[in-house]
Amino acid sequence: MIKWLARPADYGSVWDAMKAFTAARGPGTADEIWLCEHAPVYTLGQAGRPEHLLNPGLIPVVHCDRGGQVTYHGPGQVLAYTLFDLRRAGLYVREYVDMLEQATLATLRELGLEQACRKPGAPGIYVPQPGGELAKIAALGVKVRNGYAYHGLALNIDMDLSPFLGINPCGYEGLRTVDLAACGVRTSVERAGELLAAQLARAHGHAVQQRAAALAGVPG
């Protein structure tokens, strides 16, 4: 199921809802994708180090249980929270992250951003800049508990990027961030979110089908 949350969504409330959903689910619980746009907030993951918060100013900082370092969420960015049963899909965490990245790349290609790419050793999606620099356009951070995943990814659409200057994004000093608008792609948060959710649902559904076929002894 794909659903939009009320906007702007309070980060703490959504995080609590994800934890409650994950704690209550069982083997038969349907997977869900939650789409939202957050009010301005910095989030610091489990590996987050306070020295990467350079100048948060008046923007709230939330320490959360996802993987990764520090990032920023705000208006003009779409969040896709993927509440997936990884055991049902037969996915290890690294395979799951790979699936999220591939779905994001497919979404960006749909939107006309063909040059988006991955960066070895640095989760997320990047866009080459003049001079060869890679600027980050999508960030990933996941949590897996008892085989159930939550949190997900953030894709920059058309936003005020200046709050990223108050941090070392994802723990990388000097890492540049961009959005679709800066790359010459004009679209809405709603359209980008729907395309992203469709790609995520398709990729995860395919993994679930392959796992079911393997368990049944049917060639994939």
From Swiss-Prot:
Q: List the molecular function annotations (GO) for this entry.
A: lipoyl(octanoyl) transferase activity
The primary site where this protein sits is: cytoplasm
EC numbers, comma separated: 2.3.1.181
Q: Kindly state which keywords UniProt assigns to this record, in alphabetical order.
A: Acyltransferase, Cytoplasm, Transferase
What are the record's GO terms for cellular component? cytoplasm
Which chemical reaction does it catalyze? octanoyl-[ACP] + L-lysyl-[protein] = N(6)-octanoyl-L-lysyl-[protein] + holo-[ACP] + H(+)
InterPro entries reported in the protein's UniProt record: aa-tRNA-synth_II/BPL/LPL, BPL_LPL_catalytic, Octanoyltransferase, Octanoyltransferase_CS
Give the EC class as a word: transferase
Q: What does this protein do?
A: Catalyzes the transfer of endogenously produced octanoic acid from octanoyl-acyl-carrier-protein onto the lipoyl domains of lipoate-dependent enzymes. Lipoyl-ACP can also act as a substrate although octanoyl-ACP is likely to be the physiological substrate.
Q: Which gene encodes it?
A: lipB
| Binding sites annotated in the UniProt record for substrate | 66-73, 139-141, 152-154
Name the Gene Ontology biological process terms: protein modification process
- This protein is called Octanoyltransferase
Q: Which PANTHER family match?
A: LIPOYLTRANSFERASE 2, MITOCHONDRIAL-RELATED, OCTANOYLTRANSFERASE
